[in-house]
Amino acid sequence: MTVIYQTTITRIGASATDALSDQMLITFREGAPADLEEYCFIHCHGELKGALHPGLQFSLGQHRYPVPAVGSVAEDNLRELGHVTLRFDGLSEAEFPGTVHVAGPVPDDIAPGSVLKFESVKE
């Protein structure tokens, strides 16, 4: 597998886990505006080394998820802002332009130090 993007969660906003009950995980790079940081999983921004597209694999810690849909601006948001909204709903069409949909259950063990990755499953 080829790693397209990798980063490490450094801290978790006070209200970030609230979105998990709605099957969402919202990330933003370090240095996010304070009013956004409260709702985000903050990470040290990595380099995006390829396109975000359906067919990738997303992983968070030991959890692995297929990516069936990617919104039209999700790649730009990740590259420029370190921001992405992940939806754990398995939809095959992106509901919103900034959303990446993954198939599988919402992880319940996200903590600072958790590694987040997008990988190509084709060599």
Which positions does each model-derived feature cover?
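Short conserved beta-strand and strand-loop elements enriched in small hydrophobics
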Residues: 54-62, 116-119
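Short, charged beta-turn/beta-strand-edge "cap" motif at the junction between a beta-strand
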Residues: 32, 47, 63-66, 120-123
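Short, solvent-exposed secondary-structure boundary/capping segments
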Residues: 74-85
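Helix-rich interaction surfaces within compact, conserved domain-sized segments
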Residues: 26, 90-123
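Short, structured beta-strand/loop micro-motifs enriched in basic residues and often containing a Trp
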Residues: 36-47, 93-102
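Short, conserved beta-turn/loop elements at beta-strand boundaries and strand-helix junctions
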Residues: 63-64, 71-76
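Short, well-ordered loop/turn sites that connect or cap secondary structure elements
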Residues: 47-53, 58-59, 110
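N-terminal, charge-rich interaction modules
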Residues: 1-23
